[in-house]
Amino acid sequence: MMSLLPNPDPITVPLVLKLCSFPPPRRLFSLRLRRFTRKSSSLLPLVAVSSLSATAAKPTRWREKPELAESDSISLLNERIRRDLGKRETARPAMDSEEAEKYIHMVKEQQERGLQKLKGIRQGTKAAGDGAFSYKVDPYSLLSGDYVVHKKVGIGRFVGIKFDVPKDSSEPLEYVFIEYADGMAKLPLKQASRLLYRYNLPNETKRPRTLSRLSDTSVWERRKTKGKVAIQKMVVDLMELYLHRLRQKRYPYPKNPIMADFAAQFPYNATPDQKQAFLDVEKDLTERETPMDRLICGDVGFGKTEVALRAIFCVVSTGKQAMVLAPTIVLAKQHYDVISERFSLYPHIKVGLLSRFQTKAEKEEYLEMIKTGHLNIIVGTHSLLGSRVVYSNLGLLVVDEEQRFGVKQKEKIASFKTSVDVLTLSATPIPRTLYLALTGFRDASLISTPPPERIPIKTHLSSFRKEKVIEAIKNELDRGGQVFYVLPRIKGLEEVMDFLEEAFPDIDIAMAHGKQYSKQLEETMERFAQGKIKILICTNIVESGLDIQNANTIIIQDVQQFGLAQLYQLRGRVGRADKEAHAYLFYPDKSLLSDQALERLSALEECRELGQGFQLAEKDMGIRGFGTIFGEQQTGDVGNVGIDLFFEMLFESLSKVEELRIFSVPYDLVKIDININPRLPSEYVNYLENPMEIIHEAEKAAEKDMWSLMQFTENLRRQYGKEPYSMEIILKKLYVRRMAADLGVNRIYASGKMVVMKTNMSKKVFKLITDSMTCDVYRSSLIYEGDQIMAELLLELPREQLLNWMFQCLSELHASLPALIKY
């Protein structure tokens, strides 16, 4: 261990002697050195670097000489770490191997339940069997022109199935003919059944970027590897999040008798699905020690809000706070009104709405009440996730319509999931949410039973004509109702306003969109809710939440510009009363629509029955592409390998997640056998004043973790400027040792042209890591043998160059760690 404590590393001793030979004030330096040595193993804070102050005058900032400058590989590594990890490492406390083993086993059990359920759904059975979960395609189900994926060759176009006589037989056999970029291939039918996958979902016609080549499968192998690595990173990140979630403990909430009184206020008879959802959430809160993460998937108006209200009451009645997060201020205001009314019998429970409608003084007052715990239920939009909102004792997060939040908001929501109970409400869950629910990583309750009085919405899909629009609006107004008229962009609202004012001169018409002044928007929505405005021309700001019983016709223009989930939510704005509701979906001209847009619209027409939001989301998963499962890409890595092979690789990775685990070794057990003793320039020693203490701080940071070492280096450079080359060598050795520890390497040494790394990693993990490497130079030079990773260099390198090689090579290996579980 590189330290000035007893039993110092032999590499450090010459360095100490060399440092002592430089000319800082001798008495001050020796006093500092003695004081530092007495500190034994106490860990000094990183800020000590920036708090050191010299008693003598010194330059305001150290500047290295130009000849010492070198391309800064440490900064490049730090940038990559910050990009890959963000603040995740600091947000998740360390977990030892034994503890990780227990939680991985728990997650595996959950996975098996989820995968069995998925398998049953895919096979159209109620219970899952024990057979293999396969996504391979039946060649007879293919149509000429369909894109297919051969696992070993790549992407081709299916031509057909024909009989042909093989060379060594007189009996004709059935062959599958597939067209590739450089020729035609024929496969025996039995072989094709084992190796062929669909590139697209049925009825989908997305074109791949290129067809594969029969004469060169290396490009296909690279694409497959890229897809596999991307999947590994998805699975590992998911696994780590849930490992840490399982690790969190909280006392179960008490089963308070007043819960029954609160539930009795519900004015309707609960449906069987609702009753089950109530029970599921109650068990999560009162019988489990692990924080809840449950998805309530229910169609519009099926009673999801009541489930949330009961969860909120359970939590806040114990003195904790609840946050209700909505994607728009309109929906947030509606939640606030519903919650305020429901909790009016409990004056000690304070409800607040934080929104842009408030004055600065009102916001400041609310922020203070949240911080001190005087506000029990906080309702609002993404502003609730801001750094200025500090919660006193947050116990529950309710998220409504998660699919409408942006990337950063979703990441913030995810960060809450490791510490508080989370309840997500959605009529059309985003694919990622649905996927987690189906695979057992997340619990889900499905409310698919409509209230007895609900009538299905009648959906009309046709090309746009003004006469049809006028007729639809007139029919609704004649029965005393109101109309939503929705457009995808603000730009077209004025034109529609002019058209409707001309067609209905005596009717009150208004516009609503997100760019309006807050009070103007609020006033418009309030007047529409009161029935004073008969036609509301708007953008999809009304997509979620508006509960207006008298509005039973919605007209959506340019439907091709909306997502399927958006259309389903917009359609759900009507049909909440006992009248038959109508949704008119208008497109400009079918010839202008993409195949995907047409598929989206036909899916919506198919799901006319009530309670089909869950099935619709499954269709949406296929139409939008599975890149959205784990992130925000619309196509994701599915395009590399096709939908079915991507699925198979995903589930294979999920089912073998324990093989993605790497066992790190303690930092102080790592040996770097390289005799290198850099001499620090006297000016730098003078400037640092106490270099020994700073080196000790660097060692302690490296011993803790990579994130701490990175922060130390950045703090050092922020305070003193870029270090000289000799100090960079010292830092690089610390980085090499830290990266080796993370990778499970306990010793690195060189013998002639051969560099050897002794490791505890398995051959499978080594292959996963090298597959992830982007630099061919290092990847091709590494081989795995026994318990060693070896690299043969072209020539024997001088010591400093050898250290640089180790640094670069380990940096490449370390970059693969996000694709591995590090416990």
Curated annotation (Swiss-Prot):
It is found in: Plastid, Chloroplast. Residues 285-447 form the Helicase ATP-binding domain. A motif (DEEQ box) lies at residues 400-403. ATP binds at G298, D299, V300, G301, F302, G303, K304, T305. Keywords: ATP-binding, Chloroplast, DNA-binding, Helicase, Hydrolase, Nucleotide-binding, Plastid, Transit peptide. Residues 1-53 form a transit peptide. It holds the Pfam family Helicase_C. CDD domains: DEXHc_TRCF. Its EC number is 3.6.4.12. GO terms for cellular component: chloroplast. It is an enzyme of class 3 (hydrolase). Transmembrane segments: none annotated. Residues 465-622 form the Helicase C-terminal domain. One of its GO terms (molecular function) is ATP hydrolysis activity. Belongs to the helicase family. This is ATP-dependent DNA helicase At3g02060, chloroplastic.
